[in-house]
Design a protein with these regions (language model features):
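Conserved acidic carboxylate
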Residues: 8
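Two-component/phosphorelay signaling modules centered on CheY-like receiver
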Residues: 11-29
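Acidic, metal-coordinating helix/loop segments flanking the phosphotransfer/catalytic sites
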Residues: 30-48, 109
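Acidic catalytic/metal-coordinating carboxylates
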Residues: 33, 59-62
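Active-site residues of response regulator receiver
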Residues: 52
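Short amphipathic alpha-helix used as the core "switch/output" element in two-component signaling
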Residues: 61-74
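Hydrophobic/aromatic residues positioned on beta-strands within the core alpha/beta folds
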Residues: 79-81
Length: 119
């Protein structure tokens, strides 16, 4: 079973993403901060990452920079879900494979993005 790590500090959104990931046939875990994400990546070895860009402790950009600096993590598939108005072109230098707008995304869009990055 594929594994997806969710980095999200809003418990409602985290549960919703877990549901979508479960519906896509994958297992998931949730952390609320970039530092926790790095620990979980080392311990759990997820196949993909779903990242909120606006976290209480810091922005998702800090985690993206950290992942990019680790050769063994540079190719980890990442889906950004946020309300910030970010485009895939903005995130391409970080290796982000999909960008979903929380205010308009549908379950079908989440499933499609997950299917594409988990292939």
């Amino acid at each position: 079973m594929k594994k997806v790590l969710i980095v999200e500090d809003d418990p409602v959104w985290a549960k919703l993403m877990q549901y979508y990931i479960s519906e896509a046939g994958a297992d998931s875990r949730v952390v609320i901060a970039p530092g926790q994400a790095l620990e979980m990546i080392d311990d759990w070895h997820p196949d993909a990452l779903v990242l909120d860009m606006l976290l209480a402790s810091e922005t998702g950009v800090a985690l993206l920079n950290e992942l990019k600096s680790h050769e063994d993590l540079a190719n980890l598939p990442i889906i950004v879900c946020s309300n910030v108005g970010i485009t895939r072109d903005d995130m391409e230098p970080f290796g982000v494979r999909a960008v979903l707008d929380k205010s308009t995304m549908t379950p079908a869009q989440v499933r499609q993005a997950l299917t594409e990055v988990l292939q």
